[in-house]
Amino acid sequence: AGLTGRKIIIDTYGGWGAHGGGAFSGKDPTKVDRSGAYIVRQAAKSIVASGLARRCIVQVSYAIGVPEPLSVFVDSYGTGKIPDREILQIVKETFDFRPGMISINLDLKRGGNGRFLKTAAYGHFGREDPDFTWEVVKPLKWEKA
């Protein structure tokens, strides 16, 4: 009867994007359900903003107690300017998907868990707010044809 996981789909993309089933709300940023979703959001936004693709999804999978992700996957749905495997390589060179590093690189512990109260209304994505560090686009280096 707890509150964790009550609005999983609304917290993300309202059913438009794929979702692994892990909840964000009620979890601290060390949990990959939350931090993993944030880093793949930043990676996907950066791919599109850099012009590598018009649309994409970035997926990451983890196992408990394993410090590295089991897999990272990119699908540009055929909109990529270069092959998806090359986009994936650029993403892996730019983003650190290790759980501990996500928290550090996105500064997720700043301000304690109180900063996540804002996510209770209007979700976790799509807002320009200094506390939503995962919404900041990182420049990606690639050779434009």
From Swiss-Prot:
Binding site for ATP: 6-7, 23, 27, 31
Details of cofactor binding: Binds 2 divalent ions per subunit. The metal ions interact primarily with the substrate. Can utilize magnesium, manganese or cobalt (in vitro). Binds 1 potassium ion per subunit. The potassium ion interacts primarily with the substrate.
Reactions this protein catalyses: L-methionine + ATP + H2O = S-adenosyl-L-methionine + phosphate + diphosphate
Reported induction: By fungal elicitor.
Entries under PROSITE patterns matching the protein: ADOMET_SYNTHASE_2
Compartment(s) where it occurs, according to its Swiss-Prot or TrEMBL record: Cytoplasm
Pfam families: S-AdoMet_synt_C
Tissue-specificity statement: Mainly in floral buds and roots.
Required cofactor(s): Mn(2+); Mg(2+); Co(2+); K(+)
SUPFAM superfamilies: S-adenosylmethionine synthetase (SSF55973)
GO biological process terms on file: one-carbon metabolic process; S-adenosylmethionine biosynthetic process
InterPro entries assigned: ADOMET_SYNTHASE_CS, S-AdoMet_synt_C, S-AdoMet_synthetase, S-AdoMet_synthetase_sfam
Sorted UniProt keywords: ATP-binding, Cobalt, Cytoplasm, Magnesium, Metal-binding, Nucleotide-binding, One-carbon metabolism, Potassium, Transferase
Broad class of the protein's primary localization: cytoplasm
Membrane-spanning parts: none
Enzyme type, top EC level: transferase
EC number per UniProt: 2.5.1.6
UniProt-recorded Gene Ontology molecular function terms: ATP binding; metal ion binding; methionine adenosyltransferase activity
Binding-site residues, L-methionine: 31
Family: Belongs to the AdoMet synthase family.
Function field: Catalyzes the formation of S-adenosylmethionine from methionine and ATP. The reaction comprises two steps that are both catalyzed by the same enzyme: formation of S-adenosylmethionine (AdoMet) and triphosphate, and subsequent hydrolysis of the triphosphate.
Protein name (Swiss-Prot/TrEMBL): S-adenosylmethionine synthase 2
Native organism: Petroselinum crispum
